[in-house]
Amino acid sequence: KEVLYFYWNTRRVCMIYNEDCITTLKRDIRYDYVLTSPPDYDELGIDPKTHAWEEFLDSWVSQLKPTNNLATICTTDRKGDGRIYPKHIKVIDAFERSGWFLKKTNIWVKSYKVNMFRMNYMNILTFARKPFKVKNPHMVDVILDEKSPIVNGFKYAMSPLVCKMMIENH
């Protein structure tokens, strides 16, 4: 797995673990902040019409223990079977069941083009437990970045601009 390093300034080194969040959580490490996207239904082999994804979320959220008590979850609702599966609502419910509260919402607009099969935006949900500290509580709510990179053949990967903004704010 790839581990990325970047420097905020000359006095502090920040490490970004660019890997499966479950892998990171299994290690005995301290981490300040979580920025991740839970796997989609199909990545887990889950039927979206069942409650299995919510059960996965409950078991996963309970493992998050960032030292700054902030976690940002990026998720896109899914279109299928002639309906929209509201994954962002399920994420909010799972965090609230685990004692977190929704602190901030952002929307990443991926494109203004019409797409009959995919949502053209992503919900970026920041959750908190007290005490917590946010560097910029007045960050913009809507971010437009149409330059999604292609990662391992998957062309709807996270925007580096959005990731940078979230990390720098928290």
Task: Give the positions of each predicted feature.
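Core catalytic lobe of class I
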Residues: K1-H170
